[in-house]
UniProtKB/Swiss-Prot annotation:
Its EC number is 3.1.-.-. Could be a nuclease involved in processing of the 5'-end of pre-16S rRNA. It is an enzyme of class 3 (hydrolase). It is found in: Cytoplasm. GO terms for cellular component: cytoplasm. It comes from Pseudomonas aeruginosa (strain ATCC 15692 / DSM 22644 / CIP 104116 / JCM 14847 / LMG 12228 / 1C / PRS 101 / PAO1). This is Putative pre-16S rRNA nuclease.
Amino acid sequence: MASDKPLRLLLGFDYGTRQIGVAVGQAVTGQARELCVLKAQNGVPDWNRVEALIKEWQPDAIVVGLPLNMDGSPSEMSERAEKFGRRLNGRFNLPVFTHDERLTTYAAKGERLAQGQRDGYRERPVDALAAALLLEGWLAEHPD
């Protein structure tokens, strides 16, 4: 989905059926940071929480991670993530882009291991960090 408005601030979503990681990123720095993890019921978030994040951060666009298979083909979750993106666009009238999120959760767990976390992903989930990594990937591919 194209946008004529400069994309300065973006929110990234790492979509999941039980949890959705959220990150914020800036185009000027190309960096993103984790914000929060939203609980989801069968992939449906608390839309009031999503709306509160949109109002607080006022992003120019949204990036949703697209969970592709390792060969690049769509996964079972790909359609659900795309549907989530369409709902974000419909509810908030913001441009929504998808970005290949292969291995972001793996990379996020690797970062947490490097920080000393050995387990406890329920207590300290990696979803928001995965969202930050996928958002940084999108920003790197769209530098302007």
